[in-house]
């Protein structure tokens, strides 16, 4: 199976030897186009490091929080069944795809990065589901039952988004592995679960523990 051409070209511009391949996620039936792990097992040149930092290809990894959220929806489909769902910062689309497979009425993958939206399209096709797509969360109307979010809080400047999620959806389900002092009056932790980014980046153990938070409009 050939990798999506536009995604492969974009990845090769960052890392000349990088290749996309189909990976089955651990503890899941989902398959995604992800970077081949062999490309990560070497030192990067200064130019490669600069390019990665300027345009990080988040979409070619399945981050631990996304994997936790996808597994959670597969195990607890009542969270999305028959609902309109928006996946904020969708990346590879793993959570959006899991929501669609769990019986959501509609799932929108939302990401600022056009390459991420292409990855979502390719991965949706790989898993036999249909998604809709948006590049601007704030252009969407308040019509969603649930906003799902994975690893959007890696930058603490994004914390105000916790309120914005509830401006577009009646509920929010947020998976996060970065914020250790998470406090918000509307969000309650549902679970603390273990997962790793795929391909495995050998992240510190603390980043393999993912908290799942739920909020509902007051």
Outline where the language-model segments fall:
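Active-site capping/gating segments
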Residues: 180-218
């Amino acid at each position: 199976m050939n990798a999506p051409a536009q995604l492969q070209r974009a990845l090769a511009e960052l890392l000349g030897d990088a290749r996309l391949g189909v990976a089955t996620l651990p503890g899941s039936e989902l398959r995604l186009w992800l970077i081949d792990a062999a490309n990560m097992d070497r030192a990067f040149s200064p130019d490669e490091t600069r390019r990665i930092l300027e345009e990080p290809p988040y979409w070619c990894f399945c981050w631990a929080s996304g994997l936790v959220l996808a597994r959670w929806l597969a195990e607890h489909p009542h969270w999305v069944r028959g609902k309109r769902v928006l996946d904020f910062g969708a990346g590879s689309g793993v959570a959006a795809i899991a929501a669609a497979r769990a019986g959501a009425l509609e799932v929108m993958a939302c990401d600022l990065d056009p390459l991420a939206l292409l990855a979502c399209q390719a991965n949706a096709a790989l898993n036999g589901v249909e998604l809709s797509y948006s590049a601007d969360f704030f252009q969407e109307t308040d019509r969603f039952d649930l906003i799902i979010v994975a690893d959007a809080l890696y930058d603490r400047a994004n914390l105000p988004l916790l309120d914005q999620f509830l401006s577009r959806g009646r509920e929010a389900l947020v998976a996060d592995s970065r914020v250790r002092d998470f406090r918000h009056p509307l969000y309650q932790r549902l679970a603390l679960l273990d997962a790793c980014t795929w391909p495995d980046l050998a992240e510190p153990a603390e980043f393999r523990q993912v908290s799942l938070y739920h909020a509902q409009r007051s």
